[in-house]
Amino acid sequence: MPVLREEQHRIGRIGWLRAAVLGANDGILSTASLVLGVAAAHATHTNVLVAGVAGLVAGSMSMAAGEYVSVHSQADTEQADLKQERAELKADDKGEHEELAAIYIARGLDPALAKQVAEKLMAHDAMGAHARDELGISKTLTARSLQAALASAGSFAVGAAMPLLVTAIAPEAALIPLVSGTSLVFLALLGGFAARAGGAGVAAGAIRVTFWGALAMAVTAGVGALFGTVA
């Protein structure tokens, strides 16, 4: 019997990687924007730092809760579809065999071979075959709510800590340029890392994240300066 070589593919990381990159990006961007907005409104250094810490804590909890609820909803939908598929297999095994064969025919197999493949797969694991080929549910892409929530919250906290650390040590007079400059560097590094981990172009990933980060921080700082002037 031939020994199968186990291969590692990037799609296996997609669940936790997406949550981690999103969390870290949000952590850097939202905290830096919050700090810049409050600082632009002429708040004291202490008040700016307190606002940043509050943003870190609130953001981490919000990311964890939102990610958990979102991914859990996906998992609930998957389970409902699997339950329906089990019932259909029990009620009409022949019809499900024809349905599976039709899927393989649509993918390019000739009808005789498609029926044979469907028969063999259903004899081995009917539910697994239908989950994978009809519903698009596999172990690799199965929703994992707790894993996604922890990855999202942890990465948000790590990302938020970066501009917060700069805020803590930067002199008040240079706080805005230092926080904005270092945060853009952090975002560029994160964008490059995420692109590399996903197998995409590093430069394009870094530029994309940095552009939107710069835009968000500029808008937030502008609003803060406007309210500071009005006040």
Name what the model sees in each region:
Residues M1-S70:
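Internal alpha-helical transmembrane segments
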Residues M1-W16, V71-A153:
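Cytosol/matrix-facing amphipathic helices and coiled-coil assembly/linker segments
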Residues G12-G23, H45-V53, L113, R144-L150, ...:
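The feature identifies polytopic integral membrane transport proteins across all domains of life
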Residues W16-L34, K139-L165:
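Transmembrane alpha-helical segments and their cytosolic interface motifs
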Residues A173-V185:
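Structural signature of hydrophobic alpha-helical transmembrane segments
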Residues L189-A214:
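Interfacial loop-to-transmembrane junctions
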Residues A221-A231:
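Juxtamembrane boundary at the C-terminal end of a transmembrane helix
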